[in-house]
Amino acid sequence: ILVTGATGYIGSHICKALKEKNHWVLATDYNDNQNDISQWCDEYVNIDIRKLNGKYYKVDKIIHVAAKTKVGPSVDEPWDYYDTNVNGTKNVVNAFTCDHFIYCSTGSAFNPGSNAYAATKWGGELITQQFHDKYSLVRFYNVSGNNGFYKFDEEVSHLIRKAARVVNSKGNDHPYMPLFGTDYDTRDGTCIRNYTHIKDIVDGIVRITEADATNQVECLGSPTGVSVREVIYTMKKVSGIDFKVEPLDRRPGDIAISTVPTESKFFRETQTLEDMCRDALEYEK
């Protein structure tokens, strides 16, 4: 099984889960990621998917995770996202042949016009469908949590990690928690998302990989949508810290509601929002 983006957050967890089930794993990535996944793969190849040219390997299955994934930067740098997420996917499809191509996408692909990240991931879905007879399109929803071995970047953009970092800040005066947008047409004025633990996401990916190609979209995400205010409330409850919150203007590219439309038969929710908050608090200590 070939895994692209193997040293990243989701990719490294996938490699670990596959090896624990005795699969042979060929891991690829191209960055200076500080995560050592040598124990979670049988072979590692340093590959920049943006520069792949020609045919490389025939493998049984491919899990294509490599991508640029942040909404905000995609608004400012759309062509960088196109180069990696669309052109890079085209190169992977062309360079490797397989019996089942699993494309890791995003729930944002349901609304590709919302930002460049969503548009380019949707473009990758179209390429996968066009050039593979046997595929599975897997859409993730606001992945959070950790299993203890992954080292995140210092820059924090994820809501739950950002709240945990506020809680774990040194000193008695905790910095404020930014709240981007309080005037959305939602139940409390803030964005609603489906936060899903990395363990449940990866378990779903492994089930899909071990099954036959579905040739359809598989949505891996919690069926319960929660608002930004509700996440902040949960973090305060779990941590016991009533930290400061500062309402700010909306962020470019954010949409009001992104929820799971159809739950995949491969998804099993075992972890809660409270679990994700506890994981983040432990990591940010």
Regions found by a protein language model. Name each.
Residues D76-F101, L126-I127:
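NAD(P)-cofactor binding segment of oxidoreductase domains
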Residues I49-T84, S108-P112:
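NAD(P)H-binding glycine-rich loop region in Rossmannoid oxidoreductase-like domains
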Residues L2-E20:
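N-terminal Rossmann NAD(P)H-binding glycine-rich loop of SDR-like oxidoreductase domains
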Residues K162-K285:
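C-terminal substrate-binding subdomain of Rossmann-fold SDR/epimerase-dehydratase oxidoreductases
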Residues S105-T106, T128-F149, D173-T182:
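Conserved beta-loop-beta element that borders a ligand/cofactor-binding pocket
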Residues H64, K90-A118, K134-S136:
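Conserved Rossmann-fold NAD(P)-dependent oxidoreductase catalytic core, especially the SDR/UDP-sugar
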Residues A109-A116, V138-H158, D185-R187:
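Flexible, glycine-rich beta-alpha linker
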Residues S114-Y141, R161-N172:
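Active-site Tyr-X1-5-Lys
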